[in-house]
Amino acid sequence: MKMLLLCVFSALALTNDALVRIPLKKFRSIRRQLTDSGKRAEELLADHHSLKYNLSFPASNAPTPETLKNYLDAQYYGEIGLGTPPQPFTVVFDTGSSNLWVPSIHCSLLDIACLLHHKYNSGKSSTYVKNGTAFAIQYGSGSLSGYLSQDTCTIGDLAIDSQLFGEAIKQPGVAFIAAKFDGILGMAYPRISVDGVAPVFDNIMSQKKVEQNVFSFYLNRNPDTEPGGELLLGGTDPKYYTGDFNYVNVTRQAYWQIRVDSMAVGDQLSLCTGGCEAIVDSGTSLITGPSVEVKALQKAIGAFPLIQGEYMVNCDTVPSLPVISFTVGGQVYTLTGEQYILKVTQAGKTMCLSGFMGLDIPAPAGPLWILGDVFMGQYYTVFDRDANRVGFAKAK
């Protein structure tokens, strides 16, 4: 019996040691920062939310170039290192894209976004390998551009060898000037990777850095507590969830795309009738969907439009708002008014904004719903590359 207990405790220790933990910090989104300064994000960026998802999906297995979303509503970031010794960068761990990029020391002096962030210096790394392939991701009316380089990428205790990444020498628009993060680390499938670069997690898998080829997100929605969240590579942590995971298969291995059976606003409105496709996206704060359906949802919860595509409700009504439910894989996931309404302070006043926004993603990629942090904050989410599935459990 003693030997059995010893084996059990050894296995538990191995499981804990095998998990790579990356603390996540929550920051005020770019949209909120711009709004606080009296600027309209849409005016400054001349951008379209759907750019990232406006993709074609060819019959072949050739990589599909993606276009960068604007990250106006990204809220969580963590730290990685590039090079030897590691040069620190803060990045959005984004399940809605597949490339890693950071600003380059060789960026233009006129690139204000670059000047305000950490920059990769290949000359200070003993493991740098030159590549030089042109790297560009379309971004609104301009493009984020630079070239590929190869170096060691450090995430927590993991050192990923020979990781290709983009050194950005040009970052368009105001978004990245206001950003609290330096770059993006994409965690979606290789199919949407620009230049066919192997995503970081694919290299983690091929180099056998984790025991299980899964990663999971805990996103803390309480603004008054720390940490902001945690990304775990190699498994899940029961301290962040209750009950069991319910899994649903990935329907298209590009984004983390799944099938949603139906949605409902209380008993007064049905959405996604007959089923619909959705992306689980850690790099998006809100829940988005086809504008016609989202407009009906906003009406059902008594929300009225603001000038930036956002909707607001009377804060006094939040406790009595209808529950919004999502049926996925036969399992019902619910969000209460307190969970899908975002309370923000602007000019000393508290506003209650809807956590839903209309977004029309054209075919062949769309139409799509996007389950961002408003959803993931309530349901601890695991992304399983071994079984190509996504799992949800109630977050603590």
Swiss-Prot record:
Activity over temperature: Highly thermostable. Enzyme activity is maintained up to 45 degrees Celsius. Active at 50 degrees Celsius but with reduced catalytic activity.
- UniProt cross-references to InterPro entries, sorted A to Z: Aspartic_peptidase_A1, Aspartic_peptidase_AS, Aspartic_peptidase_N, Cathepsin_D, PEPTIDASE_A1, Peptidase_aspartic_dom_sf
* Subunit and interaction comment: Monomer.
State the EC number(s): 3.4.23.5
Group of enzyme by EC: hydrolase
List the propeptide residues.
19-61
Entry function: Acid protease active in intracellular protein breakdown.
One GO MF term on file is: aspartic-type endopeptidase activity
Report what the protein is called: Cathepsin D
- Which cysteines in this chain are paired by disulphide bridges? C107-C114, C272-C276, C315-C352
